[in-house]
């Protein structure tokens, strides 16, 4: 027996919307672009050259 949606998410759907309700995928992308973006405070951009193949043997 599969749980019903209200059993899986008793707090409701939250910020998620159906693509049909968002006006299609373009409306959803505009909603995502309008949201505030944040980066984790402990994330350090400590990547060296990701495309450096000189060290591959």
UniProtKB/Swiss-Prot annotation:
Its main location: nucleus. Coiled coil: none annotated. InterPro entries: CSN9_metazoa. It holds the Pfam family MYEOV2. It comes from the Eukaryota. The keyword Cytoplasm applies. Keywords: Cytoplasm, Nucleus, Signalosome. Belongs to the CSN9 family. PANTHER family: COP9 SIGNALOSOME COMPLEX SUBUNIT 9 (PTHR28562). This is COP9 signalosome complex subunit 9. It comes from Xenopus laevis.
